C-alpha cells in the first residue's frame, strides 16, 4: 500500500490557472511521415538566428563552402551558423528575415551546386568518456539552439545550469493548434530523441528526468514508452490537453508544482527545460558530428494540397517549401510562420527558414472566418480569467495604449508569454498580444538607452577622476621642484609676515575715547600734510618736466606779454588817477615796478629763446602792427583828453617809454626776420589796410563825439585796449590758420 501511495505521489500533476481549449487542427499534418524537400537553388542564411548577438563572419564572397561548414564564429553567447548545403557564397548583404516586420538582417547568400557534400564529420560515440565542458563546447560549436521557439543557445543554457539542476524536463507538449513537428519527430525518431535526452542528463546530472507530453499524441506516447521500456531514469508524464500547457513556466508547474518567481528563471528553482527537437539536435551534434543545418517544419492549412512535416534546410525560402507542398494561394492569401495564436504573418514569401521556424500555416478563407473590427474594452475580465500567467491583460492594455511604461512594468508585463489566450477570448476583438509586444519592445529600447547613458556617465566620471589625479600629480611635481628660499629670503619673508600681522592687529584694535577728552588727531594731520607736500612736489616736478619738454609757442608768448603790459599800464593809471588824499607808498610802488619789469624781461627772454619752429606770416605781422598803432593812437587821444588832475611821475613815464620802445623794436625785428615763404596777395593786403584804417577812423570819431562832461576812466580804457589787442591777435591767428 505504501508503494502505491508513493507511485501516486511520484506521478502527480498540477493544474495552472487560466488556459483555453481551441480547436486542435493537428490531424491535417500528423498522419504522414517526415519527408525530404528538394534542394533550393539559393539559400539565405541570416547571421542571427538565436537570442543574442550575431557571430563574426569567417567567409567572403566567392568562397566555396560545404554542408556543415561554419559561416560565423561564435564567442560567448554568440552562436555560429553553418552552410545548409555545398555551393558558392555569392553575396553577404542585408535580407528580410523571420520577423513580424520582416526586418533586414545581415545574411550570407549561397548558390547551391547540387552536390550537397558534407564536411568531414567526427562523431563521439563514446560521449560518456568526455568531460562536461567538452560536450558543452561541442554543442555550442555546432550551433545548437532551442528549437521550441525561443532560440536560446543550448550550450549557454547548460553552462548556466551548473550543478544546481535537480530536475531536467523535456517539453513534448506541443500545445498550439496546427503544429505537429515534435509529434511527428517523436513518432519517427523516438530512439534518437531519447539518446539526446541521455546526453543532456550526462551533462547536468539531475536527480530526475521528466518528459511532459499531452494526451492528444497517442502514437508519440506509444513510441516513447516502447523506447523507455527498459529505462528507469526517465519518466514519461502524460498531461491533459490544455493551451498553453507547453509554456516553460506552465509545464514546470504542471510536472513539479513549483512556480518560477516573477522576473526569474526556472534554474532558480533547480529546473532546466529543453525541447524535443533540441534533444534530437544535441544527439546529431555529439554522436553524429553534424552541425544543425535542418529542422522539422510543419506545412499545414487548407491552402496547401499536401500538408505534412518535412526536413527543411535552414535558409530555404518559404516560397520553395510551400510550392513543394502544393500551395494554392487565394486572392488575399495569408501565410503565418508559427501557430495561429503565437505566430506572425509574413509580408512576403522570400523569407528564409531559420532555427526557430516550426510551422508554416496557409489557412483558407473558411478557416480565417470573417474579419472583425477592434472595439472598445468592456472590462469583462475574460482575458484575466484566461491568462495562464495570472496577469491583468485589461490593465496592461490600458498601460500599453497610454504609454505608461512604469505601470506596465509594475504589473509584470515581462511575465507575459504572448500565448494569445487573452486575445482568443476577447469579445471586443482587441489584439492584446500585439499591444503587449509593442510595449515590451519600447521598454527594452528605454532600458537600452538608460544603459548607454549609465555607461557614458561612468566613462565621464572615470575621465574626470583621471584628470583630477593627473592634476594632483602635476601640482605635486611642481611643488617638489620648487626652489627652497635662502636664509636671507626667509628673514625677509618672516619680516613681511610680521608687518602684515602687526597691521592686522592694529586694524582690529578698538578705538577707545575717554569721556571728556578729545581724540588726538595730530598724527593723522601730520600724515595728511606730508602727503599733500609730496603731491605738490610731484606736481612741481611734473610741471618742470612738461615746461622743458614743451617748446614755447611764439604767438601764445606774445599774447601773455601783451596781457602783462596791459596789467602794468593799468597799475600805472590807477596810481596816476588815485586821489591826492591817499598818498602812494614809494616802496610799494618800487616793488610793483620791479615785479612788472621782471615779468616783462621774462616774457622777452622766452620769446627770444623760443625756437622759431613756425615761420611768422608777414601778412599777420602787418595786421598786428596796424592794430597796435591804432590802439596807441587811441590811448594817446584818451590821455590827451583826460584832465591832468594829478602830476605824471617822471620815473613811471620813463619806464613806459622804454617798454614802448622795446616792444616797437621787437615787432620790427619780427617783421625783418620773417622769411617771405609765401607771396603776399596785393589785393588782400589792400583790403586789410582799408579795414584797419576804417576801424581807426571809427575809433577817432567815437572819441571826438564823446561828451566832454563824462570823463574817461584811464583804467577802463587801458583794460579795453588790452582786450582789443588780444582779440585782434586772436582773430589774426585764426585767419592765418584758415588760410593755411
Curated annotation (Swiss-Prot):
One of its GO terms (molecular function) is metal ion binding. Binds 2 [4Fe-4S] clusters per subunit. It comes from the Bacteria. [4Fe-4S] cluster 2 binds at residues 387, 416, 419, 422. It is a peripheral membrane protein. Residues 605-615, 637-647 have a biased composition (Low complexity). Residues 369-397, 407-436 form the 4Fe-4S ferredoxin-type domain. InterPro entries: 4Fe4S_Fe-S-bd, 4Fe4S_Fe_S_CS, Ion_transpt_RnfC/RsxC, Nuo51_FMN-bd, Nuo51_FMN-bd_sf, RnfC_N, Soluble_ligand-bd. Pfam families: Complex1_51K, Fer4_7, RnfC_N, SLBB. Its main location: membrane. SUPFAM superfamilies: alpha-helical ferredoxin, Nqo1 FMN-binding domain-like. Keywords: 4Fe-4S, Cell inner membrane, Cell membrane, Electron transport, Iron, Iron-sulfur, Membrane, Metal-binding, Repeat, Translocase, Transport. Part of a membrane-bound complex that couples electron transfer with translocation of ions across the membrane. Required to maintain the reduced state of SoxR. The complex is composed of six subunits: RsxA, RsxB, RsxC, RsxD, RsxE and RsxG. Belongs to the 4Fe4S bacterial-type ferredoxin family. RnfC subfamily. This is Ion-translocating oxidoreductase complex subunit C. The lineage of its organism: Bacteria, Pseudomonadati, Pseudomonadota, Gammaproteobacteria, Enterobacterales. The gene is rsxC.
Amino acid at each position: 500500500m505504501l508503494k502505491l501511495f508513493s507511485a501516486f505521489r511520484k506521478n502527480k500533476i498540477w493544474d495552472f490557472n487560466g488556459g483555453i481549449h481551441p480547436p486542435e487542427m493537428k490531424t491535417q499534418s500528423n498522419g504522414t511521415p517526415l519527408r525530404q524537400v528538394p534542394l533550393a537553388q539559393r539559400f539565405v542564411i541570416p547571421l542571427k538566428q538565436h537570442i543574442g548577438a550575431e557571430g563574426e563572419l569567417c567567409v567572403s564572397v566567392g568562397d566555396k563552402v560545404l554542408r556543415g561548414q561554419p559561416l560565423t564564429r561564435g564567442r560567448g553567447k554568440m552562436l555560429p551558423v553553418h552552410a545548409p548545403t555545398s555551393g558558392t557564397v555569392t553575396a553577404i548583404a542585408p535580407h528580410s528575415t523571420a520577423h513580424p516586420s520582416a526586418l533586414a538582417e545581415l545574411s550570407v547568400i549561397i548558390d547551391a551546386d547540387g552536390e550537397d557534400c558534407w564536411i568531414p564529420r567526427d562523431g563521439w560515440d563514446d560521449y560518456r568518456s568526455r568531460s562536461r565542458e567538452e560536450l558543452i563546447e561541442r554543442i555550442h560549436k555546432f550551433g545548437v539552439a532551442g528549437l521550441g521557439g525561443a532560440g536560446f543557445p543550448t550550450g549557454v543554457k547548460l553552462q548556466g545550469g551548473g550543478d544546481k539542476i535537480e530536475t531536467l524536463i523535456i517539453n513534448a507538449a506541443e500545445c498550439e493548434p496546427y503544429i505537429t513537428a515534435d509529434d511527428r519527430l517523436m513518432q519517427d525518431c523516438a530512439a534518437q530523441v531519447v539518446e539526446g535526452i541521455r546526453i543532456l542528463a550526462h551533462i547536468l546530472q539531475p536527480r530526475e528526468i521528466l518528459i511532459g507530453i499531452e494526451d492528444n499524441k497517442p502514437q508519440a506516447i506509444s513510441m516513447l514508452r516502447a523506447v523507455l521500456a527498459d529505462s528507469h531514469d526517465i519518466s514519461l508524464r502524460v498531461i491533459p490537453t490544455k493551451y498553453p500547457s507547453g509554456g516553460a513556466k506552465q509545464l514546470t508547474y504542471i510536472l513539479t508544482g513549483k512556480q518560477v518567481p516573477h522576473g526569474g528563471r526556472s534554474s532558480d528553482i533547480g529546473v532546466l527545460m529543453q525541447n524535443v527537437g533540441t534533444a534530437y539536435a544535441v544527439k546529431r551534434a555529439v554522436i553524429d558530428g553534424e552541425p544543425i543545418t535542418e529542422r522539422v517544419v510543419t506545412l499545414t492549412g487548407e491552402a496547401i494540397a499536401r500538408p505534412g512535416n518535412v526536413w527543411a534546410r535552414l535558409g530555404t525560402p518559404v516560397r520553395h517549401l510551400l510550392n513543394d507542398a502544393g500551395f494554392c494561394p487565394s486572392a488575399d492569401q495569408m501565410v503565418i510562420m508559427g501557430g495561429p495564436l503565437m505566430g506572425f504573418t509574413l509580408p512576403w514569401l522570400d523569407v528564409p527558414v531559420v532555427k526557430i521556424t516550426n510551422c508554416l500555416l496557409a489557412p483558407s478563407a473558411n478557416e480565417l472566418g470573417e474579419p472583425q473590427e477592434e472595439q472598445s474594452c468592456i472590462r469583462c475580465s475574460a482575458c484575466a480569467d484566461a491568462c495562464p500567467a495570472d496577469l491583468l491583460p485589461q490593465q496592461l492594455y490600458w498601460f500599453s495604449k497610454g504609454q505608461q511604461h512604469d505601470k506596465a512594468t509594475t504589473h509584470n508585463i515581462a511575465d507575459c508569454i504572448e500565448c494569445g489566450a487573452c486575445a482568443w477570448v476577447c469579445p471586443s476583438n482587441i489584439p492584446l498580444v500585439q499591444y503587449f509586444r509593442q510595449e515590451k519592445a519600447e521598454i527594452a529600447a528605454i532600458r537600452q538607452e538608460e544603459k548607454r547613458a549609465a555607461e557614458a556617465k561612468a566613462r565621464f566620471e572615470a575621465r574626470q577622476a583621471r584628470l583630477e589625479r593627473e592634476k594632483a600629480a602635476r601640482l605635486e611635481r611642481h611643488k617638489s621642484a620648487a626652489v627652497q628660499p635662502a636664509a636671507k629670503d626667509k628673514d625677509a619673508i618672516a619680516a613681511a609676515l610680521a608687518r602684515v600681522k602687526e597691521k592686522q592687529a592694529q586694524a582690529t584694535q578698538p578705538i577707545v575715547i575717554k569721556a571728556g577728552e578729545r581724540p588726538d588727531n595730530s598724527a593723522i594731520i601730520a600724515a595728511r600734510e606730508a602727503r599733500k607736500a609730496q603731491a605738490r612736489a610731484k606736481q612741481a616736478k611734473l610741471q618742470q618736466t612738461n615746461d622743458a619738454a614743451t617748446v614755447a609757442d611764439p604767438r601764445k608768448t606774445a599774447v601773455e606779454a601783451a596781457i602783462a603790459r596791459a596789467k602794468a599800464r593799468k597799475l600805472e593809471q590807477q596810481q596816476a588817477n588815485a586821489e591826492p588824499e591817499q598818498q602812494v607808498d614809494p616802496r610799494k610802488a618800487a616793488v610793483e615796478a620791479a615785479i612788472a619789469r621782471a615779468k616783462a624781461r621774462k616774457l622777452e627772454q622766452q620769446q627770444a629763446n623760443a625756437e622759431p619752429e613756425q615761420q611768422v606770416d608777414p601778412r599777420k605781422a602787418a595786421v598786428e602792427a596796424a592794430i597796435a598803432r591804432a590802439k596807441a593812437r587811441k590811448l594817446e587821444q584818451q590821455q590827451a583828453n583826460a584832465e591832468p588832475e594829478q602830476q605824471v611821475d617822471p620815473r613811471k613815464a620813463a619806464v613806459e617809454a622804454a617798454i614802448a620802445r622795446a616792444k616797437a623794436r621787437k615787432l620790427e625785428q619780427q617783421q625783418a626776420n620773417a622769411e617771405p615763404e609765401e607771396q603776399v596777395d596785393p589785393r588782400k593786403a589792400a583790403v586789410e589796410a582799408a579795414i584797419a584804417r576804417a576801424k581807426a577812423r571809427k575809433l577817432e570819431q567815437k572819441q571826438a563825439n564823446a561828451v566832454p562832461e563824462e570823463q574817461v576812466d584811464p583804467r577802463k580804457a587801458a583794460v579795453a585796449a588790452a582786450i582789443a589787442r588780444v582779440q585782434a591777435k586772436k582773430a589774426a591767428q585764426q585767419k592765418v590758420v584758415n588760410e593755411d
